[in-house]
Amino acid sequence: MPLRASEHAYRPLGPGTPPMRARLPAAAWVGVGTIIGGVVIIAALVLVPSRASWALSPCDSGWHEFNLGCISWDPTPMEHEQAVGGCSAPATLIPRAAAKQLAAVARVQSARSSGYWWVSGDGIRARLRLVDGVGGIDQFCEEPALRICYYPRSPGGFVQFVTSTRNALGLP
């Protein structure tokens, strides 16, 4: 007995019903996944590495760490013009505050030194006496002095965010 095509055609069992829940579009799932993934990655960067791994980068070769900066010096006394032009970028002559701190440390090692250091004077000739940390400007700065070059190091914005977050959470 031959079968007719109409006997095997698809016939729904009941009237069509809409789906019970609406589905989120694929782009929304990608967006949500990206946001959650980003939060997880930032949390891992903040929580997993130790505090030491977020330290300042080391000073360049020939430079020495001093507080948040790096210093380099020439042991030969020189005139102001020569001292100002001798620091390679991004370094400049050491700022007065850092020079006073360095003088306090240096006085411990050589209390009898009477040398002078050129310091950054915002375009004017300025120097600092090593023995007592007294500075002089213009007319008092005729003699040669030592050049100490200095460049500051500061952590980037993300490193500051990480360390402040770790501090807020009480992490070591």
Swiss-Prot record:
Q: Which UniProt keywords apply?
A: Membrane, Signal-anchor, Transmembrane, Transmembrane helix, Viral envelope protein, Virion
User: Membrane-spanning residues where?
Assistant: 28-48
Q: Does the keyword Membrane apply?
A: yes
- What topology in the membrane does the UniProt record assign? Single-pass type II membrane protein
Q: Under the cellular component aspect of Gene Ontology, which terms does the record hold?
A: membrane; viral envelope; virion membrane
List the ranges whose topology is Intravirion.
Answer: 1-27
Taxonomy, superkingdom: Viruses
Major subcellular location class: virion
* Name under which the protein is recorded: Envelope protein UL45
Subcellular location field? Virion membrane
Q: Which family does it belong to?
A: Belongs to the herpesviridae HHV-1 UL45 family.
Residue ranges in the Virion surface topological domain are: 49-172
**Organism of this sequence:** Human herpesvirus 1 (strain KOS) (HHV-1)
